[in-house]
């Protein structure tokens, strides 16, 4: 078998006849005479034949001597066996099954196939007319001697070039990134190189860029728009406060080498542990792009946001991201949630208006509760119209870690970092009637 990419072939036929001498040579293509030429002084003739894509292109030749005897084509010279001339202008076809990969093409035009673990790539090579000549597969520059299933890649070249010229037009292999170590953060460059019998010097390649990535996306920023933010010592504590509806804004990243964010799932859980229905937001972010979602939260919510993100190859966090506590309470609700109790010391004496009357300094016991939002500050004052010099006032504050500014006041109840109950004594030193104690 002879192979060519040319539409026409030129060759010279030489013969001998020691008795009467050779007059002419006739060329046949698939048994049909194409041309007859007289021989030159060396008994040779040169022919140009147009090849057909739809025929076998078997070339034979016959010689006619000077007395008119013609020899049968099949019995003449090196073409006696009816050698085929395979005309093939096609190139090898290399196909790879990459449907199970996430694929992305960057701004530079480089296409990368992302995987979570070592996936199998099934590929086929084909040269329909002239047949395959060789195949070579490299991953990160390392030539594979066999595919994932143990099929030899080295023997393939030998079989394709078999001396019997048994044409192999198609072959299949299965490879995996597990066969070679990754470069950098999980990069693999797979090159499949194939040549055909029509021109074994021409090598045709298919390059596949694969990136293996097994890291789940992470939350890189969390904000509650419309709420004040306080520093917390523990993520289970409350740190965002507002008296209106707010919006939580969450940024999620899969890093510079990740596959990109596919979706984010979240649910709200209140302080009692009741979970709302989980919501999944489809993000479809490409590699290198952050995903930002906004979650509206109505006032009167007290609790946490739980969140998980999934990237484009299926990496997902084992545990939910838990936000800092969010506490929302409308002003009108605060009035019903708080409770202030003021108790003067007991006495059997009263003034003309029925108010308690004391012969000496006294004090007032104060108990304050806010089981929902907690206590952030206490403003108190003692005022009398006839002894203004002893009028007094003060402010007691509670920080976001639950520490109280005046040790004379005692914490009676708490909810994480929220101080929900306090008690204290307010001294009264006035020598006056109509003394008024205010607590806010």
Regions found by a protein language model. Name each.
Residues 1-440:
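Low-complexity, disordered linker/stalk regions enriched in Pro/Thr/Ser/Gly
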């Amino acid at each position: 078998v002879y192979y060519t990419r040319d539409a026409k072939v030129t060759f010279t036929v030489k013969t001998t006849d020691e008795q009467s001498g050779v007059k002419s040579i006739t060329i046949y293509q698939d048994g049909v005479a194409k041309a007859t030429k007289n021989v030159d002084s060396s008994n040779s003739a040169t022919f140009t034949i147009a090849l057909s894509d739809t025929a076998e292109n078997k070339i034979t030749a016959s010689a006619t001597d000077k007395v008119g005897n013609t020899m049968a084509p099949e019995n003449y010279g090196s073409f006696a066996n009816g050698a085929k001339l395979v005309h093939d202008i096609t190139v090898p076809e290399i196909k790879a099954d990459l449907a199970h990969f996430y694929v992305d093409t960057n701004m530079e035009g480089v296409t990368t196939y992302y995987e979570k673990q070592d996936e199998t790539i099934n590929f086929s090579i084909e040269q329909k007319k002239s047949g395959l000549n060789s195949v070579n597969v490299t991953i990160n520059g390392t030539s594979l001697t066999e595919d994932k299933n143990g099929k030899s890649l080295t023997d393939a070249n030998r079989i394709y070039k078999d001396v019997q010229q048994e044409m192999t037009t198609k072959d299949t292999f299965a490879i995996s990134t597990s066969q070679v170590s990754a470069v950098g953060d999980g990069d693999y460059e797979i090159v499949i190189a194939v040549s055909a019998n029509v021109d074994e010097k021409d090598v045709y390649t298919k390059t596949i860029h694969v990136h293996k990535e097994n890291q789940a996306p992470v939350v890189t920023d969390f904000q509650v728009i419309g709420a004040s933010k306080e520093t917390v010592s523990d993520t289970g504590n409350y740190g965002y406060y507002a008296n209106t509806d707010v919006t939580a804004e969450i940024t999620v990243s899969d890093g510079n080498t990740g596959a990109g964010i596919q979706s984010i799932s979240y649910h709200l859980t209140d302080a009692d542990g009741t979970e709302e229905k989980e919501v999944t937001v489809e993000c479809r972010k490409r590699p290198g792009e952050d995903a930002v979602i906004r979650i509206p939260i109505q006032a009167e919510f007290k609790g946490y946001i739980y969140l998980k993100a999934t990237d484009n190859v299926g990496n997902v966090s084992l545990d939910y991201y838990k936000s800092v506590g969010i506490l929302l309470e409308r002003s009108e609700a605060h009035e019903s949630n708080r409770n202030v109790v003021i108790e003067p010391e007991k006495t059997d004496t009263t003034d003309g208006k029925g108010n308690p009357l004391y012969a000496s300094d006294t004090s007032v016991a104060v108990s304050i509760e806010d089981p929902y939002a907690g206590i952030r500050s206490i403003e108190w004052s003692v005022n009398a119209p006839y002894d203004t010099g002893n009028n007094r006032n003060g402010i007691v504050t509670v920080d976001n870690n639950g520490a109280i500014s005046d040790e004379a006041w005692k914490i009676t109840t708490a909810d994480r970092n929220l101080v929900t109950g306090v008690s204290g004594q307010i001294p009264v030193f006035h020598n006056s009637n109509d003394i008024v104690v205010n607590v806010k």
